[in-house]
């Protein structure tokens, strides 16, 4: 029966004593931990830098713990344009990544603004209703527009988002693109970026979404006219309804849209 190999006073093939070998092993172990620590620190720097700072990642999903009682939902803040005393209140629930919303924003919204809002007939309120399950950038886009609103440029940013929807809607991440758009509309990009790369306005957008759900909104764009669900196939149909509700006679000049 072979004898167990015994530990000798020198390590095989090295000429080193056992004590020296153990010391070298401890030194190598320390070096490994130092290297691992440096690597971990580098990863942390990369992780934080990719998010634009220590504030955390840009919020792209609704907030889970937003209160849903009726009183809280009534505090959902839409973005308003027009006189508060206008006879007709038009509420829009929209998604920045929705193609139909893009068509409405491009062709119908300018007519509403010029012919109804600016004439004192309509007060329009836009609520965010991001269909985040099918439009992965919609929630972030809604937040981005509200970050622009902090600097008084909501509608300018709104228009750019819709005009360039085909570009950003197919990107893997839209954060940097949205920051570029901030510069396009003349925002302080540093302030905008700090807002976007955080959870700022996430609760506000979520409250908009929950309010729409409570009112039965299921798709975008959806509209309420003086509190009643409304559909219209053309701008002219909407204008006729507005004049009717305001008790006024429509102008003789009409549009073909």
Q: Over which residues does each language-model region extend?
A:
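A short beta-strand-turn-helix
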Residues: 71-88, 116
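Acidic active-site catalytic centers that drive phospho-/nucleotidyl reactions
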Residues: 92-95, 226
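Periplasmic c-type cytochrome electron-transfer domains
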Residues: 58-76, 254-255
């Amino acid at each position: 029966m072979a004898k167990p190999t015994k530990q000798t006073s020198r390590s095989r093939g090295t000429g080193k004593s056992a004590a020296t070998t153990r010391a070298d092993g401890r030194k190598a172990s320390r070096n490994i931990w130092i290297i691992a620590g440096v690597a971990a620190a580098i990863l942390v720097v990369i992780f934080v830098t990719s998010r634009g700072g220590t504030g955390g990642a840009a919020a792209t999903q609704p907030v889970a713990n937003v209160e849903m009682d009726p009183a809280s939902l009534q505090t959902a803040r839409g973005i308003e344009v027009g006189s508060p005393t206008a006879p007709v209140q038009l509420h829009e629930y929209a998604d920045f990544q929705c193609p139909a919303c893009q068509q409405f924003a491009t062709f119908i919204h300018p007519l509403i603004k010029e012919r109804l809002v600016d004439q004192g007939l309509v007060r329009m309120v836009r609520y965010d209703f991001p269909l985040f399950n099918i439009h992965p950038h919609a929630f972030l886009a809604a937040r981005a527009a509200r970050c622009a609103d902090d600097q008084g440029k909501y509608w300018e940013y709104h228009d750019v988002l819709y005009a360039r929807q085909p570009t950003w809607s197919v990107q893997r991440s839209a954060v940097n693109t949205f920051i570029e758009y901030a510069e396009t509309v003349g925002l302080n990009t540093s302030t905008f970026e700090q807002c976007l790369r955080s959870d700022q306005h996430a609760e506000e957008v979520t409250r908009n979404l929950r309010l729409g759900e409570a009112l039965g909104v299921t798709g975008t764009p959806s509209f309420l006219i003086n509190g009643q669900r409304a559909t219209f196939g053309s701008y002219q149909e909407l204008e006729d309804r507005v004049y009717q509700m305001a008790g006024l006679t429509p102008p003789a000049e009409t549009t073909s849209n």
